[in-house]
UniProtKB/Swiss-Prot annotation:
Enzyme class: transferase
Gene3D superfamilies reported for this sequence: Adenine nucleotide alpha hydrolases-like domains (2.30.30.280), HUPs (3.40.50.620), Translation factors (2.40.30.10)
Chief subcellular location: cytoplasm
Organism ancestry: Bacteria, Pseudomonadati, Pseudomonadota, Alphaproteobacteria, Acetobacterales
Domain of life per record: Bacteria
PANTHER family found in the cross-reference section: MITOCHONDRIAL TRNA-SPECIFIC 2-THIOURIDYLASE 1, TRNA 5-METHYLAMINOMETHYL-2-THIOURIDYLATE -METHYLTRANSFERASE
Protein name: tRNA-specific 2-thiouridylase MnmA
Presence of keyword Disulfide bond: yes
Species of provenance: Acidiphilium cryptum (strain JF-5)
Catalytic machinery residues: C100, C197
Keywords, ordered alphabetically: ATP-binding, Cytoplasm, Disulfide bond, Nucleotide-binding, RNA-binding, Transferase, tRNA processing, tRNA-binding
Gene label: mnmA
Cysteine pairs bridged by disulfides in the record: C100-C197
Recorded family membership: Belongs to the MnmA/TRMU family.
BP terms from Gene Ontology: tRNA wobble position uridine thiolation
GO molecular function, one term: tRNA binding
Amino acid sequence: MRVVVAMSGGVDSSVVAGLMHEAGHEVIGVTLQLYDHGAATGRKGACCAGQDIHDARNVADRLGIAHYVIDAEAAFRAAVIGDFAESYAEGRTPVPCVRCNQHLKFGDLLGLARDLGAEALATGHYVRREDGPEGAELHRAVDARRDQSWFLFATTRDQLAFSRFPLGTMPDKDAVRAEAARMNLPVAEKPDSQDICFVPSGTYADIVAKLRPDAAAPGEIVTEDGAVLDRHQGIARYTVGQAKRLGAASGHVVTRIDAARRRIVVGPRGAGGREVRIAEPNWLIDPPAAPFRASVKLRAGETPHPAEIDIARNLVTLDTPALAAPGQACVVYRESRVLGGGFIL
């Protein structure tokens, strides 16, 4: 079987390429160049640029597989970085990894894989794909610490059917590195990339300030009734649920962001609501007509909340109140399986 492997130059995707090659597949490695090659060379913590492209090529040479580099900088800036800055300027808290998966890895790259005559796209994501009675299913990884299922909720059923995730059954990262060492891959001890790959130094707020200076403009920190408690240095530095960097408003939590008035609104800790509305829903099940019970995660690393899901109304009703940050994902689970989700309004 011809398989395209998304190779970032890190240990995870390199091991995937090696495992697919050992399984007897015809492997084609593809690296999406997301930044200017020269400017990115040597940037610690970056991904998919400079040294990473060099590492991916070395791994491909070691395995004896084809390797191509695709210039995806313009698409990445438009779909990921542009959306990232715009969201913060509008008071939302974006998830750039979801947008990158949605538009580049399982959009453009998967389309390229099909154009190359491949029968599958394999990536280094820590998730499991299982074949169920209604087709391919998305499940949490065995390694709960590295599970990335929340970030793949926007993957369509067709994309999921075409995709393979060999690392989903790995017990931990040590096992992945052991595989890399066994295959004598040059990246076996390479450090992991950081969460936001395009912010290798400084802070994400610096990136937002360059693209949307209005998001870095100072403003007021106020209570729900409008009482001014302190000043802030830009709404891009805050998210709903945040309890740090509130100055004289210490002891409160951010309950919403009023982007039009450049105000950070705070309330007592424990504040929250039960209703969560979502946009851009994507479902990996045949949507039932009636509301149903499931659990949801409003942030990647949090404990799931029991809830009622009304697909027809794009409405999630939590059993207990919680703070939901606009722009983040509300992902619906039934045990280990991802049923779908959407972006929080």
